[in-house]
Amino acid sequence: MMIPRSLALRSGAAASLLLSALLLTGCAAAVPLEPAADAINPACADVVVHLPASVADQPARETNAQATGAWGDPAAVLMHCGVTVPGPTTLPCLNVNGIDWIEDDADAPRYRYTTYGRDPAIEIVIDSEKVSGTTALVDLASAVSGVPATSACLGVEDVPLPTEAPSL
């Protein structure tokens, strides 16, 4: 059976167009990030393999650094595993789905959340104009929970006050 030339040309053009579209969708630029100091920690590898395909309804993006993650286009949620483990702080500490997070709003509307009481520490930067911080932290809780908690945030009510006046 002979196929008419015009049909063969249209089929070839359609196939070329489809192939081009597939290639272009796979060529989205990786989100440029720097790895954290302790990104080579094996616990970070476990976190990365458990990262969700979407966070706060934002699709996962490829990154160019070890132990990182990004979601949204442009990226609205960024993750770094292996950041410096925070010590005691006066910044607010929130517990979201069993994970303690220190909240830093110094760059609002971009909020920085860092795990407290986990080593390696994980930092999440959220553009609150694009996504809900709470939703993003809930979506990431399963991956982050792979790093065991060794301590927890304390509030003023958790710290015992001395019952006697100190002697001089």
Description of each model-found segment:
Residues 2-17:
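Bacterial N-terminal signal peptides that target proteins for export
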Residues 22-26:
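C-terminal motif of bacterial Sec signal peptides marking the signal peptidase cleavage site
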Residues 28-31:
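Bacterial signal peptide processing site
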Residues 33, 50-51, 87, 99, ...:
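Secreted/processed peptides and extracellular or luminal domains of membrane proteins
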Residues 46, 50, 149-150:
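Primary mode marks residue(s) on the alpha4-beta5-alpha5 output face of response regulator receiver
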Residues 49-80:
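Post-signal-peptide N-terminal segment of Sec-exported extracytoplasmic proteins
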Residues 83-90:
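Short, charged/polar surface micro-motifs in flexible loops or helix N-caps
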Residues 92-168:
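Extracytosolic low-complexity repeat regions of secreted or lipid-anchored proteins
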